[in-house]
Structures are given as C-alpha cells and as structure tokens.
C-alpha cells in the first residue's frame, strides 16, 4: 500500500468515551492526483508519482506545466513518488484519505523545524560544566574533543556545535485516532515533524 502527501494543520486533543484525553496531530490530506505511473519496462522499477494541492499558474514552470497537462491533472504544489508492488494506478486517478480507514498505525515523514546554529547542549544534550569551582568561561562548551598526538586529529562525526533541524525526519508507528474522509482529515496520536502548514508524507507503519 502506498502513502499519501498531506499538510500538518496543528495539534489538539480528542476525548475517549471514558474521558481520557488523547493528544493528536491533525493532518489535512487532500486528494492525491496521479501524475505518472512508472513501470519496470520503462523506468527499471515500479512506482507512482502524485501531486496535491494547487499552485499559481505564474509559479508553474513550462516543463512542469507540460507534465501536468500530459497527466490531465491540475498543477499541484509539488511532486512525490511512492514505490508500488502490484498495485494498479491510472493517470489522473485521485487517491483519498479513506485508504487509511483500516490502518491502525502510520509512519509520518516531514522536515523538522530549523533552529539555526546551536551549541552542544541544545543540539546533542551534552551536560553543562561546573557553574563555579574555578570555571568562569567554559559553562556550555564541549570540553575535550579528542586525544593528543595519537591520533592527532578529531574523529569524523564528532558531536559538536552546528546547524540543528531543517532535516528529513520520520516518526514511526503513530496510532491512527480518527479518519475524517468528509473533511479530508487524519488524526494521529502524538507529534509529527515540521512546522504548521508544512508538507508531510503518511505511510502505513513498517513496524506495525
């Protein structure tokens, strides 16, 4: 089963019949329109390419416009691809949120919020050094970053200060709380990566 592209609306909570509060993220999943079907013969693998939402005509490049016209669909805000295994799709077909009606858990992929250049304490959860006891300058610095003449260098991958966030993140096995096909909404338990209104990819959970 393929996934769908949606938009993170925000977080709220829903109550069970027992009065238990469940924190949920609301994901709006408008119809995903098929723009290309990739086959083993033509492309070397099988996949389906989709778009969703809309884009101003002035923002659509000529190659994009031709691609959308060929598929017979309205220009969307992007193109996404999902590998397929045996599923049949046709150009222009619309795939809706109700495909998750019988799914218990999903994996959600998004781009995490960018936080700019951050130090080791925020970025890697390093401990801070002593507030006093002779320490007047090095409260939040890394400390030692290696040895001496051997190896005489800092190992690659050493955790240091640097750019935090704004990277692709997947949160796995989030419970599906509600599928509202009429309003095109999917409610999942817990938080998903990204800012409000950012695009997210929702797939049936790999580890479910």
UniProtKB/Swiss-Prot annotation:
Asked if NAD is a keyword of the record, the answer is: no
| Post-translational modification N5-methylglutamine, affected residues | 149
Q: Which UniProt keywords apply?
A: Methylation, Ribonucleoprotein, Ribosomal protein, RNA-binding, rRNA-binding
Q: Which residues cross the membrane?
A: none
What post-translational events are described?
A: Methylated by PrmB.
What is one term from the GO cellular component aspect held by the record?
Answer: cytosolic large ribosomal subunit
Q: Which GO terms describe its biological process?
A: translation
In the record, the note on similarity to other proteins reads: Belongs to the universal ribosomal protein uL3 family.
**Its function?**
One of the primary rRNA binding proteins, it binds directly near the 3'-end of the 23S rRNA, where it nucleates assembly of the 50S subunit.
Protein name as it appears in the record: Large ribosomal subunit protein uL3
Q: Which species?
A: Actinobacillus succinogenes (strain ATCC 55618 / DSM 22257 / CCUG 43843 / 130Z)
From the broadest rank down, the organism's phylogenetic lineage runs:
Bacteria, Pseudomonadati, Pseudomonadota, Gammaproteobacteria, Pasteurellales
Instruction: Report the gene name.
Output: rplC
């Amino acid at each position: 089963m393929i996934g769908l592209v949606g938009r993170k609306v925000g977080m709220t909570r829903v109550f069970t019949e027992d009065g238990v509060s469940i924190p949920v993220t609301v994901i709006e999943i408008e119809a995903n329109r098929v723009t290309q079907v990739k086959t083993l013969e033509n492309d070397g693998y099988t996949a389906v390419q989709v778009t969703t939402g809309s884009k101003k005509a002035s923002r659509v490049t000529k190659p994009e416009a031709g691609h959308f016209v060929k598929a017979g669909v309205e220009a969307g805000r992007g193109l996404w691809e999902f590998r397929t295994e045996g599923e049949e799709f046709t150009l222009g077909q619309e795939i809706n949120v109700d495909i998750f009606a019988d799914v218990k858990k999903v994996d959600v992929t998004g781009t995490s919020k960018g936080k700019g250049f951050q130090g080791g304490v925020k970025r890697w959860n390093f401990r801070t050094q002593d507030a006093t006891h002779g320490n007047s300058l090095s409260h939040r610095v890394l400390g030692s970053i290696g040895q001496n003449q051997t190896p005489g260098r800092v190992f690659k991958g050493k955790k240091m200060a640097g750019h935090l966030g704004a990277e692709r993140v997947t949160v796995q096995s989030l419970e599906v709380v509600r599928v509202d096909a009429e309003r095109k909404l999917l409610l999942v338990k817990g938080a998903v990566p990204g800012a409000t209104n950012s695009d997210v990819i929702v797939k049936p959970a790999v580890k479910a």
